[in-house]
Amino acid sequence: MAALVEPLGLERDVSRAVELLERLQRSGELPPQKLQALQRVLQSRFCSAIREVYEQLYDTLDITGSAEVRAHATAKATVAAFTASEGHAHPRVVELPKTDEGLGFNIMGGKEQNSPIYISRVIPGGVADRHGGLKRGDQLLSVNGVSVEGEHHEKAVELLKAAQGSVKLVVRYTPRVLEEMEARFEKMRSARRRQQHHSYSSLESRG
């Protein structure tokens, strides 16, 4: 079990940094162009995505040691998550309440199918649909801090079922890969149907 840690206040810290930059701009002590550029970075969606993933990993990683050790390990894990998404959408954190009606989405793929695990359907009117943060085509990277990259389908299902109260998902949107995966599965199903039809026809001709 991960040790209890003080919750992070990174959003508050970023807001304070932005306020400081605004004061420095008014003072005229530093070149305003550079200050404005830094302010835009801190207020960007990319910075928010990094902060959300960092906070999610910091809260859930099972790490013992000082706050400095924990922060260093979390930073490495955050960099790894964004490096893995290079060329794709950046990771996002989606938190959903866990209720008796389920989470309201389906997944497909897994190690046994030689593919990532994907959100294949968001059920209309379900929890995920009402929340609005999850999309068909999202690749599932982790469930409550446990990575499911390279894992079997059943591992992700077990983690989702075991979640209590709420579930935090780290996902990234790569719909093209899902479409390719679905096309591959459909091709395999069509080949099986043709084979079954051929076998049935052969049996009929013998009869």
From Swiss-Prot:
Forms two exclusive ternary complexes with CASK and CASKIN1. The brain-specific heterotrimeric complex (LIN-10-LIN-2-LIN-7 complex) composed of at least APBA1, CASK, and LIN7, associates with the motor protein KIF17 to transport vesicles along microtubules. Forms a heterotrimeric complex composed of MMP5, LIN7B and PATJ; the N-terminal L27 domain of PALS1 interacts with the L27 domain of PATJ and the C-terminal L27 domain of PALS1 interacts with the L27 domain of LIN7B. Forms a heterotrimeric complex with DLG1 and CASK via their L27 domains. Disulfide bonds: none annotated. Plays a role in establishing and maintaining the asymmetric distribution of channels and receptors at the plasma membrane of polarized cells. Forms membrane-associated multiprotein complexes that may regulate delivery and recycling of proteins to the correct membrane domains. The tripartite complex composed of LIN7 (LIN7A, LIN7B or LIN7C), CASK and APBA1 associates with the motor protein KIF17 to transport vesicles containing N-methyl-D-aspartate (NMDA) receptor subunit NR2B along microtubules. It comes from Rattus norvegicus. Induction: Up-regulated by cell depolarization and calcium entry through L-type calcium channels. Residues 198-207 have a biased composition (Polar residues). The kinase interacting site is required for proper delivery of ERBB2 to the basolateral membrane. Residues 187-207 are annotated as: Disordered. Keywords: Cell junction, Cell membrane, Exocytosis, Membrane, Postsynaptic cell membrane, Protein transport, Synapse, Tight junction, Transport. Belongs to the lin-7 family. This is Protein lin-7 homolog B. Gene3D superfamilies: 2.30.42.10, L27 domain. It is a peripheral membrane protein. Residues 10-65 form the L27 domain. GO terms for molecular function: PDZ domain binding; protein domain specific binding; protein kinase binding; protein-macromolecule adaptor activity. It is found in: Cell membrane; Basolateral cell membrane; Cell junction; Postsynaptic density membrane. GO terms for cellular component: basolateral plasma membrane; bicellular tight junction; cell-cell junction; MPP7-DLG1-LIN7 complex; plasma membrane; postsynaptic density membrane; postsynaptic density, intracellular component; presynapse. PROSITE patterns: L27 (PS51022), PDZ (PS50106). Pfam families: L27, PDZ. The lineage of its organism: Eukaryota, Metazoa, Chordata, Craniata, Vertebrata. Its main location: membrane. It comes from the Eukaryota. Residues 93-175 form the PDZ domain. One of its GO terms (biological process) is exocytosis. A motif (Kinase interacting site) lies at residues 1-13.
